[in-house]
Amino acid sequence: MLRNLISRHPSIAICGETRFFADIYKRRSAFGPLDNFENRERLVDQYLSTARVHRLGLDVAALRQRLLDEATSYPAFLATIMRFNSDFRSKERCGEKTPHHSFCTETLSEWYPGAFIIHLVRDPRDVVASLQRMKWAPKSIWNNAWIWTLFNRGAERSRHRPGYLLVQYEKLVASPEAELARICEHVGEKWPESLSVADEESTPYSWPMSARGPVTRDRLQKWRDQLTPREVSLVERIAGERLQKYGYESNGRAASPSTVVHALAVAGYEMVRQRVVNLPYMWFYHTQPTNLPLHEYWKFRRAWKNMFPDSAPPNGRAK
């Protein structure tokens, strides 16, 4: 949601999820230095063949040529995608939003001196309640609560940077114009007073309608209806001191030992299940570069995943 709101600014374009570090940088040993044209071409063609890139709403053919011309290093690869996105939308300034990049904010700050890091935080109980409904997310409360904790811990590593800014989701939806003005001031821009965020605006990015529609408070504290008291106690136990640190009040109920043991069992089941489901990905990842056509890999991966229906383990939820 924040990405789409900021991208309404006439000078700023925030690119969708590139997953640069997971899909590209971690595999740099397989592709080699990008100042070699053959290495660069192989990486560009493989990356641009993924569905994720097409969801960015860009001219993929033009992006390919731009990457071949300019992406002579891994930092330049990501920068080229961001710059192409802003040029494509006739904007002057660029940015990118991938949640997993919260673990890499220090690397990004070193690559791009003067970069701004906007750390968006939300009530962990609402985050977990939302993740429980996502097909791609873990099915256990324990694992989803740790996702919130680890992602925020990663982003906190750059709080000493001048470019770091903490934004609270609840304040953003309560006073969107005021928060957007604060963000713009932080990055050296001014939020146009005539620009309203009250109305729904179309977006070039493919993402759930909840993230693309008008700003609403309807999703605040949904956890009260969607999580059981024991699940809430688990989330608060894992969130720990960060719950109060970010301004959220505890529900006041401690998780019992039996609740923790049960949650760990469910989390363990889910972890093993996900490892099995992801076996094709791990194989493909560790055998790069490979001559296997990408469409054949995706065909096999989908068939493999269909063998494991998306379902929680028996009695997987804490009552």
Stretches found by the model and what they are:
Residues M1-I12:
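A conserved segment at the C-terminal end of the G1
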Residues N4, G16-T18, H119-R122:
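Glycine-rich, histidine-containing beta strand-loop boundary motifs that form or position
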Residues A13-E96, H101:
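PAPS-dependent sulfation machinery
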Residues R27, E156, E189-K319:
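PAPS-dependent sulfotransferases, especially Golgi type II membrane carbohydrate sulfotransferases
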Residues R27-S29, M82-P214:
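PAPS-dependent sulfotransferase catalytic domain
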Residues Q65-T72, P138, W142, E170, ...:
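Charge-dense, low-complexity intrinsically disordered segments
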